[in-house]
């Protein structure tokens, strides 16, 4: 497994690419996963696209195989417990936050470390929100973007409070023995799907959820679903200048298709498609249709 230090934190990454006999390098496509997931669920999509792209997959800070904190911050935090030194306390407080904009800056830093100047962005769910922020903060570094299962939503104080309470409970109750119980992977993923996906994918989702760093999982629940996010994301979609495809699943219960349609309607640079008979993972539930729409978009824009 390959790791790289990004802003002081060890990040897991991998390349899925096919050696080319042509000397000219292929364009890079970067895949960004969603909440409590990892790059693993992008592997099949990347493999399908590696004839045209060098595909870079990575685990977000605090998720999958990436660390949640830098070693320096962890040591500083432990030191604060044992000392009242203001200097040590200040060092501990330099820890990166779980604001989605911070994750967009993580992505920019990753590209810097790998000496990638420009790339295609292919992002999903919370990762698509991170991708949207990246498009607007680093537009000169993006060729085109594909945002899957993304959208805009209205703030509802009671609904958000209930979601945060439930989400906090889910994050706190994650015993490792859950992965050993038969059929738990089916129950865990059921809400996210309309069509079945391979058993290996189901198990990977559950494993990634159990692996997620507590602070990162909890922190991003509050930053991705919040009054601030509800107010910010419509403005971010309006600002997009990069050619973008927004893909929704028809029966997505997490980010309903109407939210995606509303987001795309805010900007002529954003093309919208809905994949029938899929939910929150259209790239896995109906890979042929998903890939067809993605390739059509890439071909049309390139043409």
Residue ranges and their predicted role:
Residues 26, 34-37, 125:
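Active-site glycine-rich loops that stabilize anionic/oxyanionic intermediates
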Residues 278-291:
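Catalytic histidine-centered segment of alpha/beta-hydrolase-like enzymes
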Residues 157-161, 178-238:
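Conserved alpha/beta-hydrolase catalytic His-Asp/Glu region
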Residues 9, 21, 44-47, 57-126, ...:
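Active-site loop/oxyanion-hole signature of alpha/beta-hydrolase fold enzymes
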Residues 240, 246-248:
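Short beta-strand/loop motif that positions the catalytic acidic residue
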Residues 136, 143-176:
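Flexible "cap/lid" loop of the alpha/beta hydrolase fold
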Residues 251-255:
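Acidic catalytic loop of the alpha/beta-hydrolase fold
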Residues 34-44, 55:
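Serine-hydrolase catalytic-loop signature spanning alpha/beta hydrolases and amidase-signature enzymes
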